[in-house]
Amino acid sequence: MDITLLLTALILGIVEGLTEFLPVSSTGHLIILGDLLGYNDEASKVFKIVIQLAAILAVCWDYRERLIKVAVGVPSDRSAQRFVGLLLLGFLPAAVLGFLFHSTIKNVLFNPLVVATALVVGGLIILYVEKRAYHPRVTSVDEMRWGDALKVGFAQALAMIPGTSRSGATIMGGLIFGLSRKTAAEFSFFLAIPTMLAATVYDVYKNWTLLRVEDLPVFAVGFVASFFAAMWAVKSFIRFISNHTFVVFAWYRIVFGIVVLATWQFDLVSWSTP
């Protein structure tokens, strides 16, 4: 087994886990790093599905008590039914757009230059949102209205553009629509479960012929790295936003995006282009 490939899997797994639930775009980071590390062949498509699944399972594990309570209560508990309804409503816009444009978006927009541009634009939007007067109307997911979930769902649909960040779009959308920081972040985490599971199932369906037994050790390394990195990131992020704004993530996005664009402009790196 190629040690370099295993190390690449470890790096990408950690990056996926750390960035999946932060407003910095995990997909964008994987596209850029995959291109930089030369891991963008057919097998890499399946690998990215595997490490994304690991991140989903990590957030399920972190919130297992809440999720089990909801699952058990769905048949008879109105609050559990309402919670599931909020998630399904928030999931709907991305589901429809993903079904219609999934292949087009992946074929046309999944390249480092689009990602870098989206990182910068998204960072500027975060700075704008943070400068607005902030008076949260909703302080827990249970207080959310149906309209809140749908509006956050439309914000999530914007994140189909790589580099935008699904969590960034949903959290910033939540803040704009009156959710508290913690509520916006937690709803973003919960909303990730049906959204990412659906995307994972669809990607597996489209790419299952690319699965090879010899790739399993690489996938296993990436899966484990992503799972534990995501577990740590989710807990740390919730603690962080209790006392901080998202400005640091905005500047990180802007600087990272500008660096990638500069390396392309001055031919320092041969990035893949459409």
UniProtKB/Swiss-Prot annotation:
Catalytic reaction equation(s): di-trans,octa-cis-undecaprenyl diphosphate + H2O = di-trans,octa-cis-undecaprenyl phosphate + phosphate + H(+)
Assigned keywords, A-Z: Antibiotic resistance, Cell inner membrane, Cell membrane, Cell shape, Cell wall biogenesis/degradation, Hydrolase, Membrane, Peptidoglycan synthesis, Transmembrane, Transmembrane helix
One Gene Ontology MF term: undecaprenyl-diphosphatase activity
Gene Ontology BP terms: cell wall organization; peptidoglycan biosynthetic process; regulation of cell shape; response to antibiotic
Annotated localization: Cell inner membrane
InterPro entries in the cross-refs: UppP
Record field: transmembrane: 3-23, 43-63, 83-103, 108-128, 157-177, 184-204, 218-238, 246-266
Major subcellular site: membrane
Enzyme class (EC, first level): hydrolase
Statement: the UniProt record of this protein carries the keyword Transferase: no
This enzyme's EC code(s): 3.6.1.27
Bilayer disposition of the protein: Multi-pass membrane protein
Signal peptide residue numbers: none
Gene Ontology, cellular component aspect: plasma membrane
Pfam families with a match to the protein in the record: BacA
Domain of life: Bacteria
PANTHER family tied to this protein: UNDECAPRENYL-DIPHOSPHATASE
Function: Catalyzes the dephosphorylation of undecaprenyl diphosphate (UPP). Confers resistance to bacitracin.
Family to which this protein belongs: Belongs to the UppP family.
Further facts: Bacitracin is thought to be involved in the inhibition of peptidoglycan synthesis by sequestering undecaprenyl diphosphate, thereby reducing the pool of lipid carrier available.
Protein name as annotated: Undecaprenyl-diphosphatase
Organism field: Azoarcus sp. (strain BH72)
